[in-house]
Amino acid sequence: MTQENNNSTNLKTVIIPFHEFIANELGNNCIKPNDEILTVLLKREEWEGHEDGGETPTELSDRVKNWQPYDARKDRQQLTRVEQIQYQLKYGVKSLQLILGQAFYRISLVNAIMHRQYEQGVKVTSRGRAKNILGVVKWNATYWPQYLKYYGFSGILNYCLTVLDYRRVFQLSVFTIAMGAGIMRFGLAQKLTKTQPTYVISAEKFSVQPKSKSEQNLLMEKVFGKKLPKALENPIVLYVEPLGLTNIQLRDEGTKEITNYPFIGLTPETLTTHRSARPMVPTYEGLEKFDADYLKAIRAASYLIDQETLKNVIDTGTVSKNSIHSPNFFEKVDLNFFEYEEFDEKTDNNQSSVQELSQFFNPKMIRTLSTEGISLGTQPDWKMAGPKLQTNTLAVNDVYPLIDKYWSESKADQIHKTSADFQLENSVGKLTSAAYRTESEFDFNDLEDFDGLEVDEWDDFYFDRKSFRAKTAERENEKFNEFLMQTSMDELGLYKNGFPSLELKRINENLTKEQFKDLELIGGLLPSIFTWYAFYTLYQFRLNYIYNVRKKPEPILYTRLDHFGRLQNKVKLNEVVGIDGGGEAFDKLFSALQRARGMGLYLPTVLLTIWESSLSPLIPGELDNWLLTQRNKVRMNFIKHTTSKVDFLMPEVTLAQKMLSDPDKTSGYESRFHFLTHAVDSAINKMDAFEKSNSKMLSNLELTLQESKTKMSKIRHLQGLLPIMKVKELFKVTLKLLQLIENELSHSPVISALKPGRYGLNTLPKGMLLVGDPGNGRSFLARAIASESRLPVFKTESTRFLDVKFGVMRLMSLFRRVRDQAPGILFIRDIDLITIDRERTNSPELIQLTTQFLICFDGYYIGSEARPTQRKIFTLGSVSDITRMDPACLRSGRFEWVVNLRKPILGERKFLLLQKASQSPVQIDATIAWNYFGLMSEGFTNAEVVSIVNNSTLQAIRKNEFVHTNESLNEGLNSIFQLRWNQTVSKAADEGFFNELHLSEVINSNKLTVDYTMNEKERPFKTKCMHLLTTVKNWSPKNNPTEISSLRMQNIGMSIQTQPVDYSQELIVELLDFMAEGAFIRQLRRCSPANTFVTQTSYSGQLGERLNKTFLKGCLNYRMENTLALIENPTQGLKTLSGTISWEALNKTALKDLQQRTALFTSWYKSRMFCQLKPDQRSLTNRYGYNPNYQQTGSSSMNRFKDRIKARLRESTHQAHPLYAMSGSIRGTFGSRGYETRLQRPLTGPVTQMSQEFLNIQFK
């Protein structure tokens, strides 16, 4: 087979599965007018040119142009909101088909030219390829914005839907948006100038690694010229090859320096064969290479537009200004721009190449496909290029009055009101009216870089964003601040009826011409909304197909939709389904790990991450139906306030965020305190009631937005990415509001919803141990944590380090490589083999290995220098027996978190059996005695329980019965017994044995639900990983009682515990969060079993405050105590807490009220911290000034405050603790000085007394 045919076959293989996916999966849910369009586009002949039987470009454009997806009999204005949404869904898939087909049709033109050139006898060498593709390269770079404008979006999207499993599409969402924005910027650079040192090479067979000096010089000469231009310090070359990253080395002839340039690949042909090509899915091995370098290259690509360079190009007249912004730009471009003189003049391929280019790249045809072909609207007065979102796009008729007002005086004769002229310039992701700009009015400052995806870690890569934008920051601030004073989010209509809209008909008429230009940048939302809309359409049809057509519940992917709309609303999993079986410990772990990547915390638990990362979900149908009901309940949160009739439920991404609403025109409390409205329905209702009862007080509240430094940051504010920076006069209602939403926020970190992404791995312990027998999911949980955190994962076996000669060297090399890729996760299996207790072994090699591990674990890994590294990594270790480990590994500061992965109990085994059987390819007999098999599998691990069903499936298929029976399950049970103990379970004599068991279960009404005997109030997930979400336990005191003394010594040396929180440099909102932590910390017991997690040094929320064991039993830590004590002093404390807030605005009444209620809050809380203290500890020595060895500090007001607390504690010394259901005797430390508490007897009681006392507090 020739090389050409092989390429064509590969292309065909890539494309056809998408058509099959649409036809098979969506079926009759998609209306199919002119369905032959897609069929023709996907023909093999089409990829080799229309001469081989495909449609001509004119026929294709006419067919697409005449297709009318909407009902022409109905006028757009007559459709209700529900009907509009229904039409969007009805034709969404057909729209996606056309867009993807158009994108691949255009890409095929480049391939066709290359194939034609190869057929003409051109030698397949690096020199020949470079010479013959140069015209295509330059043409591609010039026409990129219109010719391949959907390549970064639809091309990758289509590939994800075809080659990859469609369930993984959501993992590529971030990659798609970032890559799309980067490519658009490349297109703009090449469109404006020939000398910009950024080229797009679209040759499939072109070697990217010059192997000789001649090839290297040739590539430099053909692509960059004689030597690298000095206009750009960090040139990037896009190489349209596989989805991977490679490097190319180019030497500057002037300086003789060799530089590595990253190459970014996009085409799908070689993904499965190229080892460096990795999709955006967690692969756990080699992820560090892809994650770090690839995304950095994408980030670098997004900054290639230099404003000064563009200005110089225009000033020098390299390219005509009119041709850039004229709607007839494609018709004015001269084909001589391809510069064929660089081809070999001795060959006669030049003329034929010109003819091929003219034939395939007809500018009129390209423009037709770009503007008309993918426009889904039928009304001639409101079409626009790009995907049509119906009412969520810019209606030209609505803009005419606005434009007339701006331009009527002097520019009326230049206005051409044609729908095609008003189009989307995808090259920069901005909305611009090309027909309404003249040569003198174009301002290149409008080309502010548009970030495809904002990720904090990438900000300083290649360019300093502050200096990059500082040139126009002052002018933009002044201009845009004036704009914000005259309009609001509601007036812009960007969030009309809870749906992201771009209708501009409600714009304030007082806007100036410059402000209108700024307003056009809001069009940067369009690429994201389109990408979100495409995924959302597929998701909705997938959902409808599963639940209405096949009638078989299956796992549904819905989570990552909030990437596309780029809105801030993130629905926590515990808000959707209630209690998350992992408790707050896992929330904090996942939250901190994910913040290290700069992304928000969307779903802080394991379940749906396992779902998304292609691991076995094992979700039963009845549970999934229940989850769907809860999701719908959350989606209705804001929609029910804006529409009276809603037949369709919007996803979480479209929940409205009116962060900039005018307080005078918007009475909704959620618009001014949006950070409090991330709870569920009951929280919103309570806040609404509170607003009505405290309207006078709320009228004095004021929300001040921090002034933005750049125009695009303000645009992001309009998109819903605006964080709350300053809140004045808020403390007078803080405690009351916290009480109203306390129960709703009890299971989710408050700070996580307010300020995600601020703190990183330095707030975490260094490691966590996964303890349990093999087969209970230690590696499974490690993969789930890695997938949720989105961090590079390094997996290794501890046996690699047991080598006597190279073991220590390998260990040092491992930590060095991991820290070079920090932040990341290191997972070591059977870590107890390299952390043997040094007192129990005489082997010098094992002693040396354990010592070296501790040195590397603490960060002292660089040679012999005893200095710690600042690169943070999180170490996960799996161990079967923790008693074999060295006590030094379990002390505070190292492996502080321990997860015990126990064997499943009876209820879990029964549920796991039924769950696995329901997902097997065979049926289930209704007479199976599940209780019997659950009892007989006592002591089995989770893997062995699943193996019972697997063996039963094989038995059923072998007997050609295809049904699970009692006999087949019994065979599976026997196989496990035979393997473990070399014995079998006695078989039943006849069917009567199992029938009798089944009848007994029916009579006793035994339900197949999980039996949780630890805590009846807990409702964890019914899933395979429920046994993984066990509580974090403190193993160190249990196995090493002598560690308490050393731990106390460690705590004494922690100076951080002796200082109050310094909020002079922090935001006032964080003080609110900190107080909120104290308000809801007593709810921690609700999300964990009776044996709650106890850590040597734990952490609370994102503020990074050090807690301890006693605090988790109900105590505020030392820093919080000092902070709340400072609040009591209104003259010093408040100024200390935040020096940037003008506290003079708080009147005397508010200060007095805050002082009284803060003292009541603190004293009441502390009076119930301890149920019984030791006799020598009842005076709270080392804490309130009664220890003679403790030197008192602070004012007399502080001492009086301590005396009141001491008196309250004396009164409640022998009272039962009313807050927590605890049992057992627990020893621990408290604060930095260290003392012990002992709980003498079990404690019970709800959290009613404290809540009632707070609710009785009245504002004066």
Curated annotation (Swiss-Prot):
A GO CC term attached to the entry: chloroplast
Gene3D superfamilies documented for this protein: 1.10.8.60, P-loop containing nucleotide triphosphate hydrolases
Major location (coarse): plastid
Domain of life, source organism: Eukaryota
Stored InterPro entries: ATPase_AAA_core, P-loop_NTPase
GO molecular function, one term: ATP-dependent peptidase activity
GO BP annotations, alphabetical order: proteolysis
PANTHER family xref list: ATP-DEPENDENT ZINC METALLOPROTEASE YME1L1, METALLOPROTEASE M41 FTSH
Name of the protein: Uncharacterized protein OtCpg00170
